[in-house]
């Protein structure tokens, strides 16, 4: 059976997840955000940035609540970073 890839939804200092749209640029923004935080990969899932292999030291949620504050990813690069 396929092993679950560990990951989570990163949150800012107010414990807000990062909102995103299901556009290519936002998938890239989420990936760049995740890599900046020490994760290996990231994408937009249910309008929320999700990171794979996010270090335990990074504040994160394991699931999305129905009512949640959303942090913006405006300012995160939307092009592939080296």
Swiss-Prot record:
List the protein's name: Toxin NaTx-13
Note on domains (UniProt): Has the structural arrangement of an alpha-helix connected to antiparallel beta-sheets by disulfide bonds (CS-alpha/beta).
User: In UniProt terms, what function does this protein have?
Assistant: Probable sodium channel inhibitor.
User: LCN-type CS-alpha/beta domain spans which residues?
Assistant: 6-70
**What is one GO cellular-component annotation here?**
extracellular region
Give the miscellaneous note: Negative results: has no effect on Nav1.8/SCN10A sodium channel from the grasshopper mouse, a species pain-resistant to C.sculpturatus venom.
A Pfam family of this chain: Toxin_3
Q: Which GO terms describe its molecular function?
A: sodium channel inhibitor activity; toxin activity
Native organism is Centruroides sculpturatus
**Cell compartments where the protein resides:** Secreted
InterPro entries per UniProt: LCN-type_CS_alpha_beta_dom, Scorpion_toxin-like, Scorpion_toxin-like_sf, Scorpion_toxinL, Scorpion_toxinL/defensin
Keywords in alphabetical order: Disulfide bond, Ion channel impairing toxin, Neurotoxin, Secreted, Toxin, Voltage-gated sodium channel impairing toxin
Q: Superkingdom of the source?
A: Eukaryota
**Disulfide bond entries:** 16-69, 20-44, 30-49, 34-51
Which family does the similarity line name? Belongs to the long (4 C-C) scorpion toxin superfamily. Sodium channel inhibitor family.
Tissue pattern of expression reads: Expressed by the venom gland.
Q: Which SUPFAM superfamilies match?
A: Scorpion toxin-like
Q: Which GO terms describe its biological process?
A: defense response
